[in-house]
Swiss-Prot record:
It holds the Pfam family PRA-CH. GO terms for cellular component: cytoplasm. Residues 122-221 are annotated as: Phosphoribosyl-ATP pyrophosphohydrolase. One of its GO terms (molecular function) is phosphoribosyl-ATP diphosphatase activity. It comes from Haemophilus influenzae (strain ATCC 51907 / DSM 11121 / KW20 / Rd). This is Histidine biosynthesis bifunctional protein HisIE. The lineage of its organism: Bacteria, Pseudomonadati, Pseudomonadota, Gammaproteobacteria, Pasteurellales. NCBIfam families: histidine_hisI (TIGR03188), PRK00051.1 (NF000768), PRK02759.1 (NF002747). It catalyses: 1-(5-phospho-beta-D-ribosyl)-ATP + H2O = 1-(5-phospho-beta-D-ribosyl)-5'-AMP + diphosphate + H(+); 1-(5-phospho-beta-D-ribosyl)-5'-AMP + H2O = 1-(5-phospho-beta-D-ribosyl)-5-[(5-phospho-beta-D-ribosylamino)methylideneamino]imidazole-4-carboxamide.
Length: 221
């Protein structure tokens, strides 16, 4: 991104900045930056705004610890609005809500918001499990699985897959949820064992579902 393209005169010295979660794509907040705030944000890789009420620079999370870690930045086509993709720590809104945009008008929107929050949590869980790959096996079940190798992990995936299927045949929804949870956990460990992550699986799903009615195995059914 070429920050020299920003038309500071057009925005009266304050650039509107949209903050978006890089993983879930949920819009988290809107703030404003002057040139000093933008320079500080780029240098420190943590979002810093210019507070119009306090008339000073304000790093998001400087009090709460809920920083917005910068991952990507992009100007819009008119060079007068900035989009920042972030990896947020904790809630973004001062009310404790995950996003400042949480006052939806319909139950469907509220459900969508919760889905975003759940997905964000899963991404954090995957990162946590990935970090356990090289941890001390004596203190971590995940590390123990990695220490035992691919065959052991694959065996666990197979076992949990069968148990999930049996629970479904028995029409036991609570057991399906329990076994599917174990299956997803062990499958995540297996992906990390193979130096893969869930985003690669999701990308393949997106590739296979480009057309309406596209079958997961690649054929149209």
């Amino acid at each position: 991104m070429n920050i020299t393209k920003i038309d500071w005169q057009k925005v009266n010295g304050l650039l509107p900045v949209i903050i978006q979660n890089i993983s879930t794509r949920e819009v988290l907040m809107l703030g404003y930056m002057n040139e000093e705030a933008l320079t500080k944000t780029i240098k420190e890789r943590k979002v810093t705004f210019f507070s119009r009420t306090k008339q000073r620079l304000w790093t998001k999370g400087e009090i709460s610890g809920n920083f917005l870690n910068v991952e990507e930045m992009s100007l819009d086509c008119d060079n007068d609005t900035l989009l920042i993709l972030v990896d947020p720590i904790g809630a973004t809104c001062h009310t404790g809500e995950y996003s400042c945009f949480h006052q939806f008008t319909s139950p469907q929107s509220e459900n969508k918001k919760q889905q975003f929050a759940n997905w964000a949590w899963f991404i954090k869980l995957e990162q946590h499990l990935k970090e356990k790959k090289n941890a001390d096996p004596s203190n971590s079940y995940t590390a123990t699985l990695h220490a035992k190798g691919t065959k052991k992990i694959a065996q666990k995936v197979g076992e949990e897959g069968v148990e999930t299927a049996l629970a479904a045949v028995a029409q036991d929804k609570a057991e399906v949820i329990s076994e599917a949870t174990d299956l997803v956990y062990h499958l995540t460990v297996l992906l990390h064992n193979q130096d893969l992550q869930w985003y690669e699986i999701i990308a393949k799903l997106q590739e296979r579902h480009q057309g309406i009615g596209l079958h997961p195995e690649g054929g149209n059914k």
